[in-house]
């Protein structure tokens, strides 16, 4: 007889109305992990302006997101992810860790470069900061278009060409994607709204990656509304003057 699954509840930041999902890439990351694991779980949005007594008791520190697994409370996104990968494991649940270590660091610089770009108000610095973001996107594009070791036929003398894989580590979503995709989504929404900047078409690998990601429910259905992201960056994104 299969062991009964403990109750799993993910507490995430609420949006501007105090109910729908708010802008938080860490919350979306864990939401995606739980969905990909195929586990039964609930998601509770927490209004950061009006925390309920229950939430205060469960997590006095109030750091979101946090996870309730049975009667255990888990905090810190990285530690929660490690915990879920350890307890929700094969054969009952899929392993989500990337096979190639490089997949975990692909695109790692993008969010920092984006933050510097969007927070800048000095027009004289804008071009260089935009170039920094483009350079980080180019590194990701190179990774996505370069074949992974398991795509390379070592017996063939022919050039393997461009990788056609769907995601960072192959044709299935992994923990690496759960980390990167929510941040890439924010970059797209915020840059378009506050800088009129879109990821250039020349980065075909990045565009292919995003198309494949938006076609997956686990990503598309866990994204906050664009308006929530724009609102979160309303005071952060500095006008050039």
Swiss-Prot record:
Enzyme Commission code(s) on record: 1.8.-.-, 1.8.5.1
Transmembrane segments: 26-46
Phosphotyrosine PTM positions: 233
Keywords: Acetylation, Cell membrane, Chloride, Chloride channel, Cytoplasm, Disulfide bond, Endoplasmic reticulum, Ion channel, Ion transport, Membrane, Nucleus, Oxidoreductase, Phosphoprotein, Transmembrane, Transmembrane helix, Transport, Voltage-gated channel
Annotated positions of the N6-acetyllysine modification: 13, 119, 131
Membrane-protein topology: Single-pass membrane protein
Modification type Phosphoserine: residues: 121, 156
Modified sites of kind N-acetylalanine: 2
InterPro entries noted in UniProt: CLIC (IPR002946), CLIC-1_C (IPR030259), CLIC_N (IPR053823), Glutathione-S-Trfase_C-like (IPR010987), Glutathione-S-Trfase_C_sf (IPR036282), Glutathione_S-Trfase (IPR040079), Thioredoxin-like_sf (IPR036249)
Reactions that this protein is recorded to catalyse: L-dehydroascorbate + 2 glutathione = glutathione disulfide + L-ascorbate; chloride(in) = chloride(out); iodide(out) = iodide(in); thiocyanate(in) = thiocyanate(out)
GO molecular function: chloride channel activity; oxidoreductase activity
Motif position, G-site: 24-27
Locations listed in the record: Nucleus; Nucleus membrane; Cytoplasm; Cell membrane
GST C-terminal domain segment(s): 93-233
Major subcellular site: nucleus
Description of how the protein assembles with itself and partners: Monomer. Homodimer (in vitro). Interacts with TRAPPC2. Dimerization requires a conformation change that leads to the exposure of a large hydrophobic surface. In vivo, this may lead to membrane insertion.
Family statement: Belongs to the chloride channel CLIC family.
Name of the protein in question: Chloride intracellular channel protein 1
Gene that produces this protein: CLIC1
């Amino acid at each position: 007889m299969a062991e009964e699954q403990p109750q799993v509840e993910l507490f995430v930041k609420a949006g501007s109305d105090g109910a729908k999902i708010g802008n938080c890439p860490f919350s979306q990351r864990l939401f995606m992990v739980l969905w990909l694991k195929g586990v039964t779980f609930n998601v509770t949005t927490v209004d950061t302006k009006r925390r309920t007594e229950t939430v205060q008791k469960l997590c006095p520190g109030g750091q979101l997101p946090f996870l309730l697994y049975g009667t255990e409370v888990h905090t810190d996104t990285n530690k929660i992810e490690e915990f879920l990968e350890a307890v929700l494991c094969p054969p009952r649940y899929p392993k989500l860790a990337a096979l190639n270590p490089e997949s975990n660091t692909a695109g790692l610089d993008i969010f920092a470069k984006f933050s510097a770009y969007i927070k800048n108000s000095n027009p004289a610095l804008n071009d260089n900061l935009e170039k920094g973001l483009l350079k980080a996107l180019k590194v990701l594009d190179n990774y996505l278009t370069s074949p992974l070791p398991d795509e390379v036929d070592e017996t063939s003398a022919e050039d393997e060409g461009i990788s056609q894989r769907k995601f960072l580590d192959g044709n299935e979503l992994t923990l690496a994607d759960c980390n990167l995709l929510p941040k890439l989504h924010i970059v797209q929404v915020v840059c378009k709204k506050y800088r009129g900047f879109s990821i250039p078409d020349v980065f075909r690998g990045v565009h292919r990656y995003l198309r494949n990601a938006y076609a997956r429910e686990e990503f598309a259905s866990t994204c906050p509304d664009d308006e929530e992201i724009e609102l979160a960056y309303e005071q952060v994104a500095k006008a050039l003057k």
